[in-house]
Regions:
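Short, positively charged and aromatic/hydrophobic N-terminal segments
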Residues: 3-6, 11
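Generic start-of-chain signal for non-secretory N-termini
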Residues: 12-19
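Positively charged, low-complexity intrinsically disordered leader regions
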Residues: 25-44, 56
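N-terminal nucleotide/polyanion-binding subdomain common to many enzyme families
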Residues: 27, 35, 135-186
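Short loop/turn microsegments at loop-to-beta-strand junctions
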Residues: 39-41, 53, 164-166
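Short beta-strand scaffold segments in enzyme catalytic cores
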Residues: 41-47, 168-169
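Zn2+-dependent cytidine deaminase-like catalytic core
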Residues: 44-145
Length: 186
């Protein structure tokens, strides 16, 4: 009986993690088309009682990242809270500071990440930093959805080429125009 209760609790916790991560994915999507060359990232900060105390997303390149925006909203309520982030927090200095450092300095107790960042400047270093700071790290929550959200970014980073979408219209017999050359209504 005790094993069932623990198992049930784990399942409920997992469902909660997925619900918060879904919200983070919704936030990230708000920046679609504005973040290049950076990925779309969303972050939700949740206190011990399960209340959302901060939300943020990366609006555009050069501006604060999702984690920093969510921490700014959460303020001191971030202490001991859980951060749900759609992509591994960055670990390098660029136009902004590393998000893994910002999360640690804010006193975040746990970070739940949808997927790892394949960018060689990050590539596991953000999570390693968090673990070294004594922060619990969970990965893979809504991973498939997060990877789909940033297909363009992942293709550029891993394959060194743009993500291409092709639209092709043809007739039922596989042609792109009629015998007369008319392609207006195919």
């Amino acid at each position: 009986m005790r094993f069932f209760i623990l198992l049930e609790g784990d399942i409920l916790a997992r469902m909660t993690d997925e619900a918060y991560m879904q919200r983070a994915l919704e936030l990230a999507l708000q920046a679609e088309g504005n973040t290049s060359p950076n990925p779309m990232v969303g972050c939700v900060i949740v206190d011990a009682e399960g209340n959302i105390v901060g939300e943020g997303y990366h609006h555009k390149a050069g501006e604060p990242h999702a984690e920093v925006n969510a921490l700014a909203e959460a303020k001191q309520m971030a202490q001991g809270a859980t951060a749900y982030v759609t992509l591994e927090p960055c670990a390098h200095y660029g136009r902004t500071g590393p998000c893994c450092v910002a999360l640690a300095r804010a006193g975040i107790g746990k970070v739940v990440v949808a997927c790892l960042d394949p960018n060689p400047k990050v590539a596991g270093q953000g999570l390693e930093y968090l673990r070294l700071q004594g922060i619990e790290v969970v990965t893979g929550v809504c991973e498939k959805e997060a990877k789909r959200l940033n297909e363009r970014f992942f293709t550029w980073i891993t394959k060194q080429r743009p993500f291409i979408t092709l639209k092709y219209a043809m007739t039922l017999d596989g042609k792109i125009a009629t015998a007369t050359g008319d392609s207006k209504w195919i």
